[in-house]
């Protein structure tokens, strides 16, 4: 029991003082989460029978009323639950390769190493590499002449490469090999004089780079309505390609419309949507069939992470995308006994561990895994950092 300067000191630190009565309440909670809010208006140094006591009591009641809604939200979120982890999840081979390229470039050349755009779409990855000495820029004209620059995993247009060469930059290309494959397809069709319909989102960096391979030949098709209305100069000389991080079912619906409208359209030699995107969507679809809530860990600018949340939502399950555990909303967990959890291909898996740890703080958690396959893909590194 404290008063005076001691009370003020505790108040400023937000300390929680547990007395013997509160300890009895803790025992009654049987090891589960609990909170105790106590108001002390009587201490040896400040007896109850004095003029200021009613004021202190009324102030305490107002404080309790303000705290009550938050405590109710917290209470509703507590309880035992099962967490179903989607497998595979988190980093794909292309993301691992891109991050390793920046790490190796820093080891070999020393800081600063410049990176055009985010190496992958995840704020935590970018922050860690920044702490190591990577400098992220929007365009290569921000890089000092002669410096080392890494091109991000999403790929770039030939114009960006030309700008880098003109500045005498030492370029290390971290473009995902599966994205590079789409670039190769687009160039091949353009050289044949064919129109290319690129299924994807026009504001995504991957699409910007792919379009840049043949701007006069490529038209972006963003949705089913665009697929129904897009026109090409010669319907008999047309091909289509896909952004690698799309929702599989949505992309196929768009492609089906294009195949119906243009019977002679050339399809990709192999599905452009990458194996990791497909695998993670299949896993979250399986998880969504048996949970009350889905949480996807990933940054909001990550296309594949957003698609995971959308796939879960289309299964009729509430789904939320969070950058990390700090964005969890307790109100989502009210009455929820089964939580599905995944992470986008650019999100570190330790962020998933932090979410599980947070849920464990709200009650006993049983963790299970729902696996729809395993991944053993490994891409080689560019020669600039491979030795």
Residue ranges, per PLM feature:
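Glycine-rich phosphate- or other oxyanion-binding loops that anchor nucleotides, phosphorylated ligands
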Residues: 1-77
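The feature marks the mature, well-folded catalytic cores of soluble enzymes
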Residues: 79-345, 349-387
């Amino acid at each position: 029991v404290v008063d005076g300067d001691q009370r003020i000191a505790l108040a400023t630190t937000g300390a929680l003082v547990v007395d013997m009565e509160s300890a009895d309440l803790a025992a009654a909670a049987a090891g589960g989460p609990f909170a105790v809010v106590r108001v002390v208006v009587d201490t040896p140094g400040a007896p109850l029978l004095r003029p200021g006591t009613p004021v202190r009591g009324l102030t305490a009641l107002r404080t309790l009323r303000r705290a009550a809604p938050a405590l109710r939200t917290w209470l509703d979120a507590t309880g035992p639950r099962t967490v179903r982890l989607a497998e595979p999840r988190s980093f794909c081979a292309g993301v691992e390769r891109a991050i390793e390229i920046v790490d190796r470039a820093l080891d070999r050349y020393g800081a600063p190493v410049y990176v055009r755009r985010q190496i992958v779409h995840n704020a935590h990855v970018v922050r860690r590499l920044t702490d190591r000495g990577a400098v992220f820029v929007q365009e290569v004209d921000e890089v000092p002449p002669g410096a080392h620059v890494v091109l991000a995993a999403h790929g770039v247009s030939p114009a960006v490469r030309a700008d880098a060469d003109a500045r005498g930059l030492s370029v290390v290309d971290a473009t995902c090999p599966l994205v590079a494959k789409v670039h190769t397809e687009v160039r091949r069709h353009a050289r044949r004089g064919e129109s290319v319909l690129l299924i994807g989102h026009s504001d995504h960096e991957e699409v910007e780079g792919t379009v840049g391979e043949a701007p006069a030949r490529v038209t972006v098709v963003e949705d089913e309505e665009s697929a129904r209305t897009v026109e090409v100069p010669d319907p008999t000389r047309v091909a289509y390609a896909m952004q690698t991080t799309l929702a599989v079912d949505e992309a196929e619906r768009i492609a089906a419309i294009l195949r119906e409208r243009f019977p002679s359209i050339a399809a990709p030699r192999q599905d452009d949507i990458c194996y990791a995107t497909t695998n993670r969507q299949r896993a979250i679809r399986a998880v969504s069939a048996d949970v009350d809530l889905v949480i996807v860990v990933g940054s909001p600018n990550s296309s594949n992470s957003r698609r995971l949340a959308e796939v879960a939502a289309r299964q009729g399950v509430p789904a939320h995308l969070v950058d990390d555990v700090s964005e969890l909303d307790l109100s989502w967990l009210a009455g929820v006994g089964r939580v599905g959890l995944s992470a986008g291909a650019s999100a570190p898996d330790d962020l998933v561990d932090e979410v599980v740890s947070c849920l464990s703080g709200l009650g006993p958690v049983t963790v299970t895994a729902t696996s729809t396959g395993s991944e053993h893909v490994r891409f080689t590194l560019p020669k600039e950092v491979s030795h």
